[in-house]
Amino acid sequence: MKLFLKLLLILVSTALFAQTQPVKKNHFQTFGNVIKTSFNTIPNDFVYLGKEFSDDWKKTGYYAAGILGLIATDKITTKAWQDYVEPNIDYRLPNIRPGFLNGTKNTWLIGENAYLTYPIIGLYAGSLLANNEKGQYVGVNAFKAIAYSTLITQVALKSIFSRNRPESPLNTTTKGAPFTNNHWDFFNGREETIIFSNPKGTALPSMHVTTYFALAKVLQMEFDNYWVPYGLMTVVFFSNVVGHQHWTSDKVVGALVGTLIGRSIVRSSWKARGILDTSKKGRLSLNYVPRISSEFTGLRIVGTF
């Protein structure tokens, strides 16, 4: 089983890496250009992330209201998750961490996370050897997704909201403080280290879900493929699903934030690489406008290209 999973990871990395382009630069030129461009786009990564919220305040308001509604119903939905999902999805992916990393405490190199991190490392290493510029950009953007997701969730959002994690099971005192049965238990502060602190005040949003969706979005946009990145992300997420210990809204917010992070990274990278986003070009958008007047009563359909 362990050998099969390792072979599967190699095949996934190979499938993603297989999209090549004509070689125009030597290895060192390609490597240097990718690193320089990716470093220079860091400010724009966050500019694009900010635009995700500021470009359409009405939509942002709808999302905020929806999240508030999820928080209000968290006790019901989280209890249902604990009662019906966690007991019925019970598996653990085998450990694939190499022996020389046995002493590492980096959460992205151990456990289930390794199934996402190692293929990215393999993709980037293979792209370096093959002088594949696109593969190198994808690898760097994926590493950015991990770094940004970790910093935004652990340093910024969790420090701001400081929400405590739910008891497991809810309505008990099985774990005790800082786990809680109160879904409005916010602003509790943080203790010890900020990046990987103890459980107090670390519920909203889920760092793992944020990172999983950020990585999946980067790969989906770069390779125009939903099945491989989101399929792998789903398998990894449900491995040891009990261990996540989050309210439902924590995971939903993580998925939204992660998607925005991944999309912002790729759009910023595409702009620097001269790749135009033509995904909406040629699509017909229809707007339906009711019209009532003395001359006409009906539905006006306006098409935009």
How would you name each of these model-derived features?
Residues 28, 68-78:
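Alpha-helical transmembrane segments of multi-pass membrane proteins
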Residues 64-69, 131-139:
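Membrane-interface helix-boundary motifs at transmembrane edges
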Residues 68, 124-125, 155, 237-238:
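Alpha-helical transmembrane segments of multipass membrane proteins
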Residues 72-73, 126-132:
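Structural signal for the C-terminal ends of transmembrane alpha-helices
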Residues 76-90:
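Interfacial/capping segments of alpha-helical transmembrane domains
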Residues 94-119:
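Interfacial helix-start motif at the membrane-water boundary
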